[in-house]
């Protein structure tokens, strides 16, 4: 290899080089995004003006709405925007055909349509939500201006579809062709780094339980990563055929990771109790078996897991899993020599049953990750998709709020005949749609109003004091660029995103000239007054009409979280594990966002999630064990141990639907009865944990009992049940 010249080596050794690359990976990405926004916006505006489209600004606004730092997100938003625009335009033409001569009926039907679309956006909470948003406010944006001239409604819809299509084409072209940022690369990096953090978390947890705060923080991170990776997976199919061919394995990988975290949380909860019980000798007895896994994970902790690393990990885990049963028998013999009581023996068996299942899941995860290196693989076949869970009341509240806003503003417009009333109403429809899928629509609407007010001030200066003095498209770009740069910069900052969006979209709506520029200060001021008033009404409605960040929604989502146990008990077994895992985490992720700024509420929700996952997962394992029982009288449906498990299931359903001290007492009695019935039953197989069905059943029952009695669980706040509950 030829050595570099001395001056080049000197440049490479400078400290500024490291700082430059740090900047390029952080703020540099933002400035590349801003440059691409400018390029796409001005390309779209130039083409729209050259093609003499009626409203070139509509095409340019499309760029501001769909542009994202990563090209996959742009493709996804463009796809759903086009679908939403077509649906909204079709509905607008239908409403005009039905109610063109009756403004009141038209506004009522439009309000219902926008409400339904807003509810759909709140229910989906991904890029599909964007399709609902566009379907709602496209009908308003096209229908309201043409209400006075219904004969032009169809052509208005056609022109809008063409303008938006032009904006979508330019956005996707610029995003993919100029310094592209791939969502696929972001997803691969997230997958690689996620396992490194998890391996370190597990390795340290097997040696000694984590502190409560660190344990909760780590789990919140894993939940956010699972939800985020699912979002990335749904985006990468639009941009990367390499990832599209692995879509099933990526789905499977995320599902297996969620199961992994649940199994480790269950194991950690048991280890924490055993470690804190000074009188128990169980922790010392099981520790040698756990250290072997911790040592194997040490080599993968804190670094990315590549496909080759995953294959190596899978081989190590296969060897460890093969040697584990013999090691457990050896440790059990040594433990029995100490003459432990029944409760300690159950703890011993439960700990190794949980460990064995965790290793199985970890091995399966490693195999799936390693299979990503191949274009085709048998693990691609996966029919347990990620199943998001949304509260229907929260979605309905969003729809009711949107319909109410449109009815109020539309009625005001009809009653006053204000010339800018149509602008106020359609901008309110757009605002309520854009804010419907956010955790805090009040804040988003208010920020958009602030951005619009700022855009009005800047726009007035440019429209009446700058535009008359310029000539030609280059000078127009020159005077618009500072506003767009500032707006895009604000939009890239989460704390000021609403201000940036409002500035970009509504400065363009009211201040960017068409091919034939009309200078009318009266209309300009009235239109911007209508825009700001519509947004402020949206903000007020978001604060008053069923606000999503209020106590009622936290309580409802907490109830939905608890009812996931009911789903685990009564749901269809096929695909139940994945649906339970993803639905529970999705509910927690929503509730945690709605409860922002309320740490006590967030902590309570997180504790409920832990107990729901622990009990629900154990119930699903019990159901799976019973579904594959051998044909033998000892495992018949009529056996007392199976009947007692059904009774326990009904008791758990009552407890999690309506938590109370009496229901907790009944559930514990039912669990203890199921344990005693299983202990009293005989079976035809050797009593080893890898061959005995009843031993595995006992382990899961015992774990359910310890979860119900966990002092850190929210069930502990119900009060200590009366009586002496003991597994023996």
Regions found by a protein language model. Give the residues of each.
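Soluble C-terminal extramembrane regulatory/interaction domains of multi-pass membrane proteins
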Residues: 195-206, 250-381, 565, 619-728
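Extended, charge-rich low-complexity regions and/or helical-solenoid scaffolds
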Residues: 546, 550, 572-663, 667
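A transmembrane helix-and-boundary motif of multi-pass membrane transporters/channels
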Residues: 1-241, 245-246, 364-375, 380-610, ...
């Amino acid at each position: 290899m030829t050595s570099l010249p001395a001056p080049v080596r000197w440049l490479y050794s400078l400290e500024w080089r490291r700082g430059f690359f740090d900047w390029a990976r952080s703020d540099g990405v933002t400035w590349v995004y801003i440059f691409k926004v400018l390029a796409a916006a001005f390309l779209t505006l130039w083409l729209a003006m050259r093609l003499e489209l009626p409203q070139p600004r509509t095409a340019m606004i499309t760029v501001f709405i769909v542009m994202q730092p990563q090209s996959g997100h742009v493709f996804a938003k463009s796809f759903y925007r086009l679908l939403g625009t077509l649906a909204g335009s079709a509905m607008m033409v239908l409403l005009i055909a039905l109610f063109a001569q009756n403004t009141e009926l038209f506004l009522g039907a439009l309000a219902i349509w926008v409400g339904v679309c807003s509810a759909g956006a709140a229910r989906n909470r991904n890029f599909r939500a964007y399709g609902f948003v566009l379907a709602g406010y496209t009908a308003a944006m096209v229908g309201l201006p043409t209400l006075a001239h219904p004969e032009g409604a169809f052509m208005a819809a056609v022109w809008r579809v063409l303008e938006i299509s032009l904006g979508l084409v330019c956005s996707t072209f610029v995003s993919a062709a100029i310094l592209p940022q791939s969502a696929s690369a972001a997803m691969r990096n997230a997958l690689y780094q996620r396992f490194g953090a998890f391996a370190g978390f597990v390795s340290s947890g097997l040696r000694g339980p984590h502190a409560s705060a660190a344990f909760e923080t780590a789990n919140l991170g894993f939940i956010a990563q699972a939800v985020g990776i699912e979002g990335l997976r749904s985006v990468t199919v639009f941009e990367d055929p390499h990832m599209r061919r692995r879509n099933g394995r990526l789905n499977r990988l995320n599902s297996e990771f969620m199961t992994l975290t649940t199994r480790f949380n269950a194991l950690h909860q048991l280890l924490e109790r055993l470690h804190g019980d000074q009188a128990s000798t169980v922790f010392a007895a099981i520790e040698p078996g756990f250290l072997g896994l911790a040592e194997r994970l040490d080599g993968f902790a804190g670094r990315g897991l590549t496909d080759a690393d995953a294959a190596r990990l899978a081989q190590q885990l296969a060897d460890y899993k093969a040697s584990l049963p013999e090691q457990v028998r050896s440790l059990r013999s040594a433990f029995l020599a100490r003459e432990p009581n029944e409760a300690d023996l159950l703890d011993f068996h439960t700990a190794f049953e949980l460990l064995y299942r965790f290793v199985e899941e970890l091995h399966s995860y490693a195999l799936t990750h390693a299979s990503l290196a191949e274009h085709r693989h048998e693990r691609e076949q996966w029919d347990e998709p990620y199943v998001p869970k949304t509260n229907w009341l929260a979605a309905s509240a969003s729809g009711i709020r949107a319909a109410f806003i449109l009815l109020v503003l539309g009625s005001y417009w009809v009653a006053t005949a204000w010339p800018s009333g149509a602008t106020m109403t359609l901008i309110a429809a757009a605002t309520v749609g854009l804010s419907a899928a956010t955790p805090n629509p009040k804040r988003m609407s208010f920020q958009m109003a602030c951005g619009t007010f700022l855009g009005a001030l800047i726009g007035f200066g440019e429209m009446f004091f700058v535009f008359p003095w310029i000539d030609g498209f280059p000078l127009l770009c020159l005077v618009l660029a500072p506003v767009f740069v500032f707006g895009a910069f604000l939009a890239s900052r989460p704390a000021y995103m609403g201000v940036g969006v409002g500035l970009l979209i509504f400065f363009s709506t009211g201040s960017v000239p068409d091919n034939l520029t009309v200078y009318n200060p009266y209309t300009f001021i009235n239109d911007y007054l209508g825009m700001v008033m519509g947004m402020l009404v949206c903000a007020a409605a978001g604060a008053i009409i069923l606000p999503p960040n209020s106590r009622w929604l936290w309580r409802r989502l907490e109830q939905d979280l608890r009812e996931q146990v009911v789903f685990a008990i009564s749901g269809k077994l096929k695909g139940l594990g994945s649906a339970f895992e993803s639905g529970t985490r999705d509910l927690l992720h929503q509730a945690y966002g709605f409860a922002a700024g309320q740490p006590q509420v967030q902590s309570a929700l997180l504790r409920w999630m832990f107990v729901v996952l622990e009990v629900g997962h154990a119930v699903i394992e019990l159901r799976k064990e019973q579904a594959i029982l051998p044909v033998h009288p000892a495992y018949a449906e009529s056996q007392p141990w199976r009947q007692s498990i059904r009774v326990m299931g009904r008791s758990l359903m009552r407890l999690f639907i309506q938590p109370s001290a009496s229901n907790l007492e009944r559930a514990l009695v039912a669990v203890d009865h199921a344990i005693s019935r299983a202990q009293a039953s005989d079976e035809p197989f050797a009593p080893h944990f890898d061959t005995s069905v009843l031993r595995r059943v006992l382990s899961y029952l015992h774990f359910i009992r310890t979860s119900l009695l966990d002092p850190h669980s929210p069930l502990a706040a119900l009060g200590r049940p009366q009586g002496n509950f003991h597994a023996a």
